[in-house]
Amino acid sequence: MADKPIAKALRNVLVLHGPNLNLLGTREPEVYGATTLADINTALVERATARGVTLAHFQSNHEGALVDRIHAAKSEGIEFIIINPAAYTHTSVALRDALAGVVIPYIEVHLSNVHRREPFRHHSYLADQAVGVICGLGWRGYLAALDFAIDQHGG
């Protein structure tokens, strides 16, 4: 069964990267790979631009900064959020409430397959409200999320 596109074309996407993702490329490369956060952001901007979409990205190691960025997204006209909450996946009611408060659809992305890792990583405070969750595809999971978001908006 084909998914039904949402009526209007998507124009503005925000990608949020949570704590420690600034260390990609050097932190546990056997788990997260050698690709850096800058590489991921470049690939996302290139893909979005090629598809006629404006993409902003933001990384923080601080929960409050991520919450503030989510709040700002609403007034900026952000229509879709792709978020890798990283460790906040398993702890942050604040991120969950911020996403619910702005009522912007989102996809949760994880580089590793969190279900093949420690049991505490198996629970997400964000997943049940997300459009979808992508995990275990490495940095390409971000591109899959972006393509899905654009395709669902008739782009």
From Swiss-Prot:
Residues annotated as binding substrate: 84, 90, 97, 111-112, 121
The keyword Mitochondrion is annotated on this UniProt entry: no
UniProt xrefs under InterPro entries: DHquinase_II (IPR001874), DHquinase_II_CS (IPR018509), DHquinase_II_sf (IPR036441)
Sites annotated Transition state stabilizer: 27
Disulfide bond positions: none
UniProt-listed GO biological process terms: amino acid biosynthetic process; aromatic amino acid family biosynthetic process; chorismate biosynthetic process; quinate catabolic process
A Pfam entry, by short name: DHquinase_II
The EC number(s) this enzyme carries: 4.2.1.10
Catalytic reactions of this protein: 3-dehydroquinate = 3-dehydroshikimate + H2O
Keywords from the named record: Amino-acid biosynthesis, Aromatic amino acid biosynthesis, Lyase
Subunit description: Homododecamer.
NCBIfam families named among the record's database cross-references: aroQ (TIGR01088), PRK05395.1-1 (NF003804), PRK05395.1-2 (NF003805), PRK05395.1-3 (NF003806), PRK05395.1-4 (NF003807)
Protein name as it appears in the record: 3-dehydroquinate dehydratase
Annotated organism of origin: Ralstonia pickettii (strain 12J)
Gene: aroQ
